[in-house]
């Protein structure tokens, strides 16, 4: 797709920030209050109280699956693509030896940088860098990674692939594969292995439902698990580990990928 307005993805990041505010995800509620005000956050809490247990837990489980994968991989250099208003880097950089590069498009990252400056958090014993980045721009991701300390890196994404069409997924995978080739032992951790769900419940917010339709989110998920596996294999990756959520509907997994 050409001439796409990628900044529109930030709409979902803001909606997700309100949803996460109702969870135990680090800094989620505090950031949402700073961004939207406490009254709006309380309204969001009342709204999600009407959602099913599956919907309530989905985003927290997805977030925590990345944490679990990072523990399994054990890398201290971490690059997160399209972080939105997630503050995983702020939480992880409290540990010594962590070098966390937090990236997103410039407009959203500017909002996030202001929030990070205002949030009350423990001292950082590691390093947190916030850097504007269009991960689909040729060479941009590789250039950003070159400024990381020596050693393997974990490339992380959560809530991104379903906004990319087939050609964009290929471009991103090609960039990431190049980094994994340059840095021996590196891994790609993606929480975005979604398959299409014909029984997906409607969101309570019509604006959210409209956004999902406009972005063709359901269409851009993988058709089935075989399709997801073939995509990554075709792009030169092997699945090192599959983290499956406790969810009877089983529409999403987090995968740890290495190069073949």
State where each predicted segment sits.
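A short SAM/SAH-binding and catalytic strip from SAM-dependent methyltransferases
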Residues: 152-168
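A short, conserved alpha-helix within the catalytic core of class I
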Residues: 140-141, 163-178
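Short alpha-helix
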Residues: 218-242
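A short acidic, Gly/Pro-enriched loop at the edge of an enzyme's catalytic core
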Residues: 142-155
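Core SAM-dependent methyltransferase catalytic element
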Residues: 244-260
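Rossmann-like AdoMet
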Residues: 1-79, 83-131, 139, 149
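Conserved beta-strand signature within the Rossmann-like core of class I S-adenosyl-L-methionine
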Residues: 154, 173, 178-196
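Acceptor-substrate binding/catalytic loop of class I
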Residues: 164, 210-225
């Amino acid at each position: 797709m050409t001439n796409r307005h990628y900044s529109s993805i930030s709409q979902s990041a803001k909606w997700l920030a309100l949803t996460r505010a109702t969870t135990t995800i680090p800094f989620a509620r505090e950031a949402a209050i700073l961004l939207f005000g406490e009254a709006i956050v309380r309204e969001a809490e009342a709204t999600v109280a009407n959602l099913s247990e599956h919907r309530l837990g989905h985003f927290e489980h997805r977030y925590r699956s990345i944490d679990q994968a990072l523990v399994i991989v054990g890398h201290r250099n971490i690059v997160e693509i399209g972080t939105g208003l997630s503050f995983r880097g702020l939480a992880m950089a409290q540990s010594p030896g962590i070098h966390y590069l937090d990236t997103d498009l410039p407009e959203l990252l500017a909002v996030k940088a202001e929030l990070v400056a205002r949030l009350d958090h423990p001292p950082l014993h590691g390093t947190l860098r916030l850097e504007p980045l269009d991960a689909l721009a040729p060479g941009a991701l590789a250039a950003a990674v070159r400024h990381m300390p020596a050693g393997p890196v974990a490339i992380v994404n959560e809530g991104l692939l379903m906004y990319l069409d087939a050609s964009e997924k290929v471009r991103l995978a090609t960039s990431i594969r190049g980094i994994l080739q340059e840095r021996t032992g590196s891994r790609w951790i993606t929480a975005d292995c979604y398959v299409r769900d014909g029984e997906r419940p409607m969101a309570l917010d019509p604006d959210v439902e409209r956004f999902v339709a406009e972005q063709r989110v359901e269409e851009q998920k993988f058709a089935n698990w075989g399709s997801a596996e073939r995509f990554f294999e075709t792009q030169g990756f092997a699945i090192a580990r599959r983290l499956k959520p406790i969810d009877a509907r089983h529409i999403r997994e987090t995968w740890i990928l290495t190069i073949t």
